[in-house]
Design a protein with these regions (language model features):
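NTP/phosphate- and nucleic-acid-binding module
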Residues: 1-33, 41-43, 47-630
């Protein structure tokens, strides 16, 4: 048991999962299948299967919340019993009548001799008062269970009345009096497949926030309210950036014109950065013969994350999940000398991964994405220098976007896992040691974590902690001694001998959509001017000044700025409001005074400053701001 799992807060949350299940049983007169209920991060949840007539919906959650608080205030004691296989069978199948618990019980018995149960109890003398509003059949059911347990375990259950019984191994608090009844709150109702398998039944999942006290709950609740304001899904819809539709498959994003402007600018930005570092950009197909992935090892180690194989004209094809094998083919298409290396092959590549729906999060993680990918073919002599340049590029990009809240992780394989990873211990150890040595030489603070490596190479992951949600990887850089050998890649060294290059895999923005989502949520869509889809909105104070407004617009467009004129019939104030809702950096107001002086009245969205500039002065000012990437 880890220190986290033995902490008071973990035990409180885990007990609240049982309290949640008990509350649902009370609300639905026990007509429910209970499945599993763990504590996770700031949450806990429990999965249920309801009969159609007893299904719980959002409007029922208030009743469940009230029952949870009532149960906690009952100061229920939790009693643990450990029973052998035969008795566990009786408890689960005869008393509880829970088939999903029985499925887990059978699995547990393969590893353990005894099965643990936690039983919620109240003082028996208080039963009639505490349960006076509870369904009579529910009470009779637990009278039957109480009688059995009092007979079987008199020393534990004398004077106790059972209110809930669950099979469980993890630790709990001794009594619900150790839980603040105002320290938790039901958050939402969701859906999840039993055992995370889409071939199984779909269950109802209820999520609950839980903390040590009501103050911590309020702090977290306030943070989540802020998160809703920043959520890229909401902002994407409100600002006409992108959307998802069931007709096109809800995990494939559709970018609107405003959203695609930003998407394209991000592509241009990173491509320009790479070109200055002598990257050679290529384009490779999205659909490949499946033999390519057999050669690379992806089919053996990553097929669950790939789209199904297609067969046409006696050949098998698959949508590519990643670009490594394709860039190996690009390299192999020509002969190379050591003088040619390093060769830096880059691509903004369309990739397709059939990841489970539970891991997907709109454009942050979708089944189709464009990866800012590159593969550097290097010699042992220039490997370290090239790796350092990649790290420098990562932090140069982060500086441009003001990204400061990140951590570096050296991700290594689990040596005990013989399934996930390519089995070449010598090559793997060589790559891990080389990567560790480089990290130490460039003085980057990092932590080492096992299990997170790719199946045939170790990697440096740069994880960001966004303003909302959990941290995730935004950039990655991987060292590979394996794939070049699989594709028999060679270069001629200075002695005329054939050698195998080392490959550095790297993705700076990872996927363009993920990076887009990150900066939306970090900035609340207050983007730097160079990245904003509409940089200037011109608003004439009356129709008489539309011609001048369009003249200003033409001048700005000639200088490659993104600008529009609002000539709609809305009121002047509504036009201002509309521009502010879209968070357009500059609103230019033009009227009689501006026409006479060839000037514009400027309103800045961020600073709220208002001032007047000549048109030439404003063009010069805006040009400097855009070029500075501010």
């Amino acid at each position: 048991m880890s220190e986290h799992e033995d902490s008071l807060l973990f035990r409180q949350r885990h007990t609240l999962a049982h309290v949640l299940a008990e509350a649902v049983q009370r609300v639905q007169q026990r007509d429910v299948e209970v499945a599993i209920g763990p504590a996770i991060d700031n949450w806990l949840y429990y999965d249920f299967l309801f009969s159609p007539e007893k299904q719980i919906w959002e409007e029922d959650l208030k009743k469940v919340q009230d029952q949870m608080e009532k149960i906690v205030k009952e100061w229920q004691d939790l009693i643990r019993i450990d029973v052998p296989a035969e008795e566990s069978d009786y408890l689960v199948n005869t008393l509880m009548k829970q088939k999903y618990k029985d499925e887990m019980r059978r699995e547990f018995l393969a590893a353990w001799e005894n099965i643990s149960f936690y039983i919620n109890t109240i003082v028996e003398a208080a039963k009639d008062r505490v349960l006076q509003w509870i369904d009579e059949n529910y009470v009779k059911y637990y009278e039957w269970i109480t009688e059995y347990l009092q007979t079987k375990y008199p020393e534990k259950f004398a004077g106790k009345f059972v209110t809930f019984l669950d099979m469980c191994e993890w630790p709990h608090v001794g009594s619900t009096k150790e839980i603040d009844p105002k320290s938790f709150k039901i958050d939402k109702l969701a859906w999840a497949y039993w055992r995370w398998n889409s071939n199984n039944v779909m269950m109802t999942r209820i999520y609950v926030w839980a903390f040590s006290n009501k103050e911590e709950l309020k702090e977290y609740s306030d943070m989540m309210e802020e998160a809703k304001k920043r959520d890229h899904r909401k902002l994407g819809k409100d600002l006409d950036l992108f959307f998802f539709d069931d007709l096109t498959w809800k995990w494939l994003p559709m970018y609107m014109p405003r959203g695609y402007i930003v998407y394209h600018l991000l592509e241009e930005y990173i491509r320009e950065k790479e070109t200055k570092l002598w990257y050679l950009h290529v384009m490779t197909p999205c659909l490949w013969n499946v033999e390519l992935y057999r050669t690379s090892g992806h089919l053996a180690h990553y097929q669950d994350g790939m789209f199904p194989i297609m067969e046409r004209e006696w050949e098998e094809f698959v949508l590519r999940p990643m670009n490594c094998p394709h860039h190996m083919m690009i390299y192999a298409n020509q002969l190379h000398s050591y003088k040619d290396l390093p060769i830096r092959i880059g691509e903004i590549a369309h990739d397709f991964r059939f990841e489970s729906s539970g891991t997907l999060k709109w454009i942050e993680r979708s089944r189709h994405f464009c990866q800012n990918d590159a593969h550097l073919f290097v010699t042992p002599e220039n490997m370290k220098d090239e790796f350092k340049k990649v790290v420098d590029l990562i932090f140069d990009v982060y500086k441009d976007f003001g990204i400061e809240n990140y951590r570096c992780i050296l991700s290594l394989r689990d040596p005990e896992d013989k399934v996930k990873y390519h089995q070449d211990d010598e090559m793997r150890e060589k790559a891990e040691n080389a990567l560790r040595e480089v990290m130490n030489e460039i003085w980057i603070e990092y932590t080492e974590e096992i299990w997170e490596a790719a199946f045939y190479w170790p990697k440096l992951d740069v994880n960001v902690k966004p303003a909302i949600g959990n941290e995730y990887t935004l950039s990655t850089c991987q060292l590979d001694f394996c794939l070049p050998a699989k594709f028999d890649l060679k270069y001629t060294d200075k002695d005329g001998e054939k050698k195998t290059p080392i490959v550095i895999h790297r993705a700076i923005l990872w996927a363009i959509g993920r990076f887009f989502a990150y900066i939306i949520e970090e900035t609340k869509w207050v983007f730097p001017v160079w990245l904003t889809p509409e940089q200037v909105r011109i608003i004439p104070v009356a129709d008489a000044f539309n011609d001048y407004a369009n003249k200003v617009c033409e001048e700005l467009r000639t200088n490659n700025f993104r600008v529009s004129v609002d000539e709609w019939w809305d009121s002047f104030n509504k036009k201002i409001r509309n521009a502010e809702l879209l968070k357009i950096p500059y609103i230019l107001i033009v009227g009689e005074k501006e026409v006479g002086s060839n000037s514009v009245s400027v309103r800045e969205f961020v600073s709220k400053e208002q001032y007047v500039l000549s048109l030439d002065e404003f063009v010069k000012k805006l040009d400097e701001i855009v070029k500075s990437k501010k």
